[in-house]
């Protein structure tokens, strides 16, 4: 049964990649491309470029837009003609890569919480969701928030439950919080319930230690 689900999951994922890389640009992708461009210019000029404010982009920190644009510039250096003629392909390649990594994170997290069967099924159901599938290549906001949320939850869970690699898990937890905030400033609101549950778990886990500390 697992082999059948994995085969189907792989097929749907390949279909998602093909769809993402062949579909054209959506209406708001131009905004995110320009948002990445002006912030990239600001970085490479060490703050001398001051034309980075346009429309309502003050509500979009632009970390992912800048990263996506920077990766595109690497391809531009390698093959200028290809980049100029396939800018939609390049942007969607970055987006679908992050979307696929979010599915991997969902699989790993669900496997930790439940088992392999449920992890495969959860990943497949997520991929089959038309809102997720259809946005894998062209959405530079919501699926990146999902990516940040899933990997934050995964490493925060490891930090709370495992006694090994505590520093590594804490650093990666913090990294994905920062990454999510770099996409949307409201990201802490999304992860707040998870953090509260984690703190309660940690308190109960080390409750005896706290009591001994207070007794001293």
What are the functions of these language-model segments?
Residues 1, 152-170, 202-205:
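Membrane-interface transmembrane helices that cradle and orient dolichyl/undecaprenyl
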Residues 2-29, 180, 201:
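Transmembrane signal-anchor helices characteristic of membrane glycosylation enzymes that use polyprenol
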Residues 10, 93-113, 151, 155:
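Transmembrane-helix motifs of polytopic, lipid-linked glycan transferases
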Residues 15-18, 30-66, 70-80:
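Extracytosolic helix-loop segments that constitute the early lumenal/periplasmic catalytic or substrate-binding loops
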Residues 26-27, 131, 137-145:
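Short acidic/glycine- and proline-prone juxtamembrane loop motifs at membrane-interface regions
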Residues 67-97, 116, 131:
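Juxtamembrane segments of multi-pass membrane glycosylation machinery
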Residues 122-127, 134, 154, 177, ...:
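Short helix- or helix-capping micro-motifs
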Residues 186-201:
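Transmembrane-embedded, aromatic-rich helix segments that form part
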